[in-house]
């Protein structure tokens, strides 16, 4: 992984919209990835023999299979059994044509969230894949060379956006829910912090901003883990102490409100 030039990028939480796609395209990436639920809500099905390309952009957008990825993440299935199910079900879906399936999840799924899952899933999965005559592992770059791209509007969403969330235009329910007071205040705070960050050049100081602005704070609050949600606010307080922070009072006021929300039952 190190000293390589990646051709694609995985956005945090697979949170994607047209604006992010545009930024990634300008950065020179050839592909990105997001969940297939919003796409399925819009178009009724998900492609297996062509790759979506966002309109007015050259970047391809792979669609991670929510069904198959979560079948690994949230079920007790062995690696060998999973490959055998894939062989059967994909043959039916692809109708004996070549096709592709994107399976994607956090690496922490294996061994951290699911103890012993490297031994029970990963190792036998790779062993069974090596034996298979129907299924093989390939890279996104390989898929870009093999399958045509079709221009289409890729809808906004994340890998935690349900069909119901999408229909209610709540595209990032665990991180930017318009009905969640913690989320609204956190993003108001983040907007203020980003204005300060633009004037910072010192690398050590910039690491404080990186620690402050990450998706776990809003996610933890959404999950009811308020102690962990409030933990990250200490970095915002550290930023408020910088000379460059002209909006110190407003920043501290918002932090106080966020902490009070975390103290509520």
Q: What label would you give each PLM region?
A:
Residues 8-16, 144:
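Short, solvent-exposed turn/loop segments enriched in Gly/Ser/Thr/Pro and often Arg
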Residues 1-11, 88-103:
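CE4/NodB-like, metal-dependent polysaccharide N-deacetylase domain
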Residues 13-16, 35-38, 66-68, 107-109:
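Active-site-proximal loop/turn and secondary-structure-junction residues that shape catalytic pockets
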Residues 19, 41-42, 70-73, 111-113, ...:
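Short helix/loop capping segments that flank catalytic or ligand/cofactor-binding pockets
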Residues 72-85:
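Binuclear metal-dependent hydrolase catalytic cores centered on His/Asp/Glu-rich metal-binding motifs
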Residues 48-59, 63-66, 77-80, 91-265:
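Active-site and substrate-binding clefts of carbohydrate-active enzymes
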Residues 17-26:
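Distinct, well-ordered alpha-helical segments
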Residues 1-4, 25-46, 50-60:
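Acidic, His- and aromatic-enriched active-site or binding-groove loops in soluble protein domains
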């Amino acid at each position: 992984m190190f000293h390589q030039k990646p051709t694609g990028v995985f956005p945090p939480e697979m949170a994607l919209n047209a604006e992010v796609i545009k930024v990634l395209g300008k950065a020179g990436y050839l592909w990105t990835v997001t969940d297939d639920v919003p796409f399925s809500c819009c178009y009724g099905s998900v492609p297996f023999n062509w790759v979506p390309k966002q309109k007015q952009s050259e970047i391809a957008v792979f669609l991670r299979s929510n069904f198959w990825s979560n079948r690994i993440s949230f079920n007790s299935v062995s690696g060998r059994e999973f490959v055998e199910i894939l062989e059967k079900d994909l043959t039916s879906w692809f109708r004996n044509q070549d096709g592709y399936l994107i399976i994607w999840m956090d690496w922490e799924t294996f061994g951290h969230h699911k103890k012993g899952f490297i031994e029970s899933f990963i190792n036998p999965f790779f062993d069974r894949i090596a034996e298979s005559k129907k299924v093989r592992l390939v890279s996104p770059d390989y898929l870009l060379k093999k399958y045509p791209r079709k221009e289409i509007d890729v809808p906004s969403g994340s890998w935690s956006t349900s069909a119901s969330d999408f229909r209610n235009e709540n595209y990032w329910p665990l991180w930017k829910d318009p009905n969640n007071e913690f989320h609204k205040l956190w993003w108001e705070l983040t907007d203020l912090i980003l204005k300060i960050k633009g004037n910072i050049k010192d690398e050590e100081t910039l690491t404080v901003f990186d620690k402050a602005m990450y998706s776990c704070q809003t996610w933890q609050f959404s999950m009811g883990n308020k102690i962990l949600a409030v933990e990250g606010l200490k970095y915002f307080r550290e930023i408020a102490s910088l000379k460059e922070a002209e909006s110190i009072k407003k920043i501290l006021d918002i932090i106080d409100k966020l902490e009070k929300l975390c103290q509520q039952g």
